[in-house]
């Protein structure tokens, strides 16, 4: 269960609180102690209102909320990482469950996505012990030759580190080869909570926090668009959540000027159903108010990331709508196919009409976007 911090930031009276809010409105970088205060002590209504003011200053079209149509395809479910929060993966010897998606299956899924107005594949996969750089180069180049108009938003920092390791390459060279083969952008998958202790507890075999940061920085240096994520609500403390945000902010600050860097930040709640963490006694304890606090603090701490996404898939329609008034400006994708989070207990669904209606009900105008946040 979440081990909430009981320590409180000392000496934060009304005047100091106003100073912190003013700093947020100016989009100045917050100190760790200021960020802790926002998360642990700031009244939620004040916090959400301040985050909404910052959101309206950052995103020029005040009444617009963006959304996307893409399709998630799992390249394989074979994974040697053994993350304790995932019940979708299988081990290499579990041949009755193991799969690698075939080219015919990709074609069928892509044709269906295009018919629904989609423009992007979100390709996710495990750390397969036998799928190295040659496999991914062939996959990406083949898909691009067949569907040049489809963007490939694929893998994640852990997969890149794993491919590099089994292929005898550096992560930088691996990224270069993947980009040359057709990789358009890199998801923020595999971040979870960027804390070595948390990682040891929930995903001990996954590439390290340092490797995640290294791969993302190299992607930024290559001007490969990326996103950042946080999966919260398992074994982490509130301050480890804030520290995660500070690591993301500081990594974004290292992005070369004029490069894409992190285009968006997406926090989502851990779903425990059927996972090893659940067997260890760690269960989903979703609080809508806690999620709104996280969205608001994310907007205020991440002063250098423009887009904050409301994860309707894991929190549901109503909470996502409130998040749009608390710092978030994007509703993400209708996600034509999603398996990993759904297999752990998240069963919220939207079609194109439904997500637009949800945005309108929240008082905004829906606008369809692509991965670079360009309007379609």
Predicted regions and their residues:
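Conserved, mostly hydrophobic/aromatic
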Residues: 27, 51, 83, 123, ...
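Hydrophobic faces of well-ordered beta-strands that scaffold small-molecule active sites
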Residues: 65-71, 121, 152-156, 186-188, ...
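Generic secondary-structure signature for well-ordered alpha-helical cores
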Residues: 25-26, 40, 53-60, 115, ...
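Short, small-residue-rich loop/turn micro-motifs
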Residues: 77-79, 87, 117, 189-190, ...
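Conserved Radical SAM active-site core
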Residues: 37, 90-250
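Auxiliary Fe-S-binding modules of radical SAM enzymes
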Residues: 1-45, 114-115, 245-246, 253-376
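Mobile, glycine- and charge-enriched loop segments
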Residues: 63-65, 69, 84-90, 95, ...
């Amino acid at each position: 269960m979440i081990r909430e911090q009981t320590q409180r930031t000392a000496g934060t009276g009304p005047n100091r609180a106003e100073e912190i809010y003013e700093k947020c409105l100016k989009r100045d970088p917050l100190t760790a102690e200021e960020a802790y205060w926002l998360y642990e002590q700031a009244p939620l209504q004040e916090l959400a209102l301040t985050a909404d003011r910052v959101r309206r200053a950052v995103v020029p079209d005040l009444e617009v909320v963006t959304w996307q149509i893409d399709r998630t395809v799992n390249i394989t479910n074979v994974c040697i990482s053994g993350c304790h929060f995932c019940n979708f993966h299988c081990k290499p010897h579990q041949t009755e469950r193991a799969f690698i998606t075939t080219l015919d299956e990709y074609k069928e899924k892509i044709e269906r996505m295009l018919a629904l107005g989609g423009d992007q594949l979100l390709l996710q996969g495990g750390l397969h012990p036998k799928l190295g750089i040659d496999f991914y180069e062939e996959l990406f180049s083949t898909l691009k030759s067949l569907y040049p108009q489809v963007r490939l938003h694929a893998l994640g920092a852990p997969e890149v580190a794993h491919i590099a390791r089994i292929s005898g390459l550096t992560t930088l060279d691996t990224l270069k080869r993947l980009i040359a083969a057709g990789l358009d952008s890199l998801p923020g998958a595999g971040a979870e909570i960027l804390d070595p202790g948390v990682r040891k507890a929930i995903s001990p075999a996954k590439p390290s926090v340092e490797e995640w940061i290294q791969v993302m920085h190299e992607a930024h240096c290559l001007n490969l668009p990326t996103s950042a994520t946080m999966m919260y609500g398992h074994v982490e403390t509130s301050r480890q959540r804030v520290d995660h945000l500070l690591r993301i902010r500081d990594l974004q600050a290292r992005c070369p000027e004029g490069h894409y860097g992190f285009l968006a930040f997406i926090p989502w709640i851990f779903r425990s159903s059927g996972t090893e963490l659940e067997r260890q006694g760690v269960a989903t304890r979703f609080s809508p108010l806690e999620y709104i606090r996280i969205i608001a603090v994310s907007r205020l701490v991440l002063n250098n990331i423009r887009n904050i996404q409301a994860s309707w898939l894991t929190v549901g329609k109503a909470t996502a709508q409130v998040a749009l008034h608390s710092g978030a400006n994007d509703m993400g994708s209708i996600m034509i196919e999603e398996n990993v989070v759904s297999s752990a207990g998240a069963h919220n669904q939207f079609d194109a009409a439904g997500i637009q209606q949800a945005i309108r009900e929240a008082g905004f105008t829906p606008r369809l976007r692509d991965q670079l946040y360009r309007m379609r």
